[in-house]
Amino acid sequence: MKQLTIEAFKAMLDNALKQIKAREEEFSKLDAVIGDGDHGTAIVAAMTAVNKSAQSGTEFKQMLGDMGMDVMMEVSGSTSTLLGAFFLGMSDHAEGTELDAAGVKVMFAGGLANVQQQTQAKRGDKTMMDALIPAVEAMQACTSDDIKEVLNAGAKAALDGAEATVPMKANFGRCLLYTSPSPR
């Protein structure tokens, strides 16, 4: 894919919501080990708000900005704050109705930069940053002009980064209170 259109991006968001909904119970069970067990419900609510907001989008900047604001206004908690910051950062670095691979890379880097302004967490702290930072770095390093290859490089790095957190000691959030190895 040489161009990412608004419609293709919306389809990706729809697919992401379906995947998250399918794992809602799993996410809540994992969260219940150290928290209140509502993460599955919260992330589904956040992605539902994102998808609802995206449906009226006609160009990237406006759509991503609306997605960021809506998720922060409609869903409480750190997940929605950080997800909102990510989309708002993306919106500052995306123009028009189509993006090429270079534009996608710039958009994701803008999202990461904005999240980094909202949190002190960094790679190695056992947070979402352990997946997000390597994902964006891998996307930047990908030399292909095929957007699917760029996104796949980011997805693989995100998964590897998340899996690398299993033996880590947390430096933020409720995980600070949990000393056993991460549940799988």
Task: Enumerate the language-model features and the residues they cover.
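A structural-propensity feature for long, helix-poor, extended segments
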Residues: 101-140
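Conserved small/polar residues in nucleotide/adenosyl-binding loops
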Residues: 178-183
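C-terminal binding/interaction regions
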Residues: 167-177
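Non-transmembrane, aqueous-exposed alpha-helical and coiled segments at domain scale
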Residues: 2, 27, 61-64, 101, ...
